[in-house]
A protein has these predicted regions:
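Short aromatic-rich membrane-water interface segments that cap or initiate transmembrane helices
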Residues: 49-62, 171-175, 221-233
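A membrane-periplasm/extracellular boundary helix in multi-pass inner-membrane enzymes
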Residues: 120-171, 188, 192, 323-335
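Transmembrane alpha-helices of multi-pass inner-membrane enzymes
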Residues: 73-74, 111-119, 260-314
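Membrane-interface catalytic loops of GT-C/OST-like multi-pass glycosylation enzymes that act
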Residues: 58-62, 104-111, 220-225, 277-291
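Peri-membrane helix termini and adjoining interfacial loops of integral membrane proteins
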Residues: 38-50, 156-164, 211, 215
Length: 341
């Protein structure tokens, strides 16, 4: 019901983009404060303690980076639709790009390349109107942040009464290739049980069993690749047909792109999808729920699909249940945090 008409889809996507803009800006501010070691003095921010790369309140730099990419795409949508004045978008995008560079997330680097290529393609088709030199300027700024911020951090450490941590960009780009070893080990695990797999969410079991004859670099509970995880869980007989269907579904979504909403939606989905090929963002509700919502918005643009109209009472009931679940989550979290500390 929310996206059955074009005007409704635009309105809903605009509201979603406002949420990403606000959350992304707040995330950027928190990450910069963490980098400057101010997080210990400001309430509501996670204290980095021994961590080196800022992660805002996500507790994982790569997750923060992917969320910032989605927020930047939301800013692009608001710019395209002229919903927010450019003078307000520029400082927000500046902080997000700075925080994205501070995360030193190689996953985000790969995603950025894919986003720029797809944007250029859709700009050629006429769905995106932003000038190429604007995209180039922001890209150059982002690359400049990647190389300059570690140096700026070292300078501030020497001449100010603070201890700013950073990782050399060359070492970050070429170090820690453990994912390749993990993938190799998981391929051996698939070869041991190729047809029916190990069961849902049993990657750690697969790791334990395969370690008897093929050692891996670290203990894992995920293959750091959605395709490998899905085949490990279900085996080739069930996994391959489902993966083929997912691929066909994605092809159909991209084939029917016909508006700015669908272009930005595809890019947001793609950012999380690329991340899922290198880690496991699908394990987190703050990615899974928005992606599912965006997929629904993009899917609704196909005019030849069958739709079901539900009574507003279903939505009211869903909101009520969601509110109860949110209260329970907050309660459990408030009980668990003191125990973890």
């Amino acid at each position: 019901n929310l996206s059955s008409e074009k005007a409704d889809r635009a309105s809903i996507f605009t509201g979603l983009s406002y949420v990403f803009l606000i959350a992304g800006t707040a995330t950027g501010v928190i990450a910069i404060c963490q980098w400057l070691t101010l997080d210990a003095y400001i309430p509501g921010m996670v204290d980095m303690q021994r961590a080196v790369r800022p992660y805002a309140n996500f507790a994982q730099p790569n997750n923060m980076a992917t969320f910032l990419l989605m927020s930047l795409l939301a800013c692009l949508y608001l710019y395209e639709k002229k919903k927010v004045q450019t003078k307000w978008l520029i400082p927000a995008v500046f902080m997000m790009l700075m925080s994205l560079a501070l995360s030193q997330s190689r996953t985000s680097w790969v995603a950025c390349i894919c986003i720029i290529v797809y944007l250029a393609y859709q700009q050629f088709k006429g769905y995106i109107s932003i000038k190429w030199y604007y995209v180039t300027a922001w890209t150059v700024l982002f690359v400049g942040f990647i190389f300059l911020l570690p140096t700026i951090g070292s300078f501030l450490t020497q001449f100010a009464d603070t201890q700013i941590k950073s990782v050399d960009i060359a070492r970050r780009a070429t170090g820690d290739m453990s994912r390749l070893a993990i993938w190799q080990q998981m391929l051996h695990a698939i070869a041991d049980r190729p047809w029916f797999g190990y069961g849902w969410n049993q990657t750690s079991v697969a790791y334990t069993l395969v370690s008897d004859h093929f050692q891996g670099p670290v203990w894992v509970r995920s293959a750091h690749n959605f395709i490998l995880d899905f085949i490990l869980w279900n085996g080739l007989l069930i996994g391959l047909p489902f993966l083929a269907y997912f691929g066909y579904w994605g092809y159909q979504l991209n084939k029917h792109v016909n508006s700015v909403e669908s272009v930005i939606g595809i890019l947001m989905i793609g950012a999380v999808l690329i991340h899922s090929m290198l880690e496991f963002p699908q394990y987190y509700a703050y990615f899974l729920l928005p992606v599912g919502f965006i997929v629904g918005l993009v899917q609704s643009q196909q005019s030849n699909i069958k739709t079901i109209t539900l009574s507003p009472n279903y939505m009211r009931a869903a909101y009520a249940v969601s509110l109860v679940l949110l209260i329970l989550i907050v309660r459990d979290y408030s009980v668990m945090v003191p125990k973890l500390n």
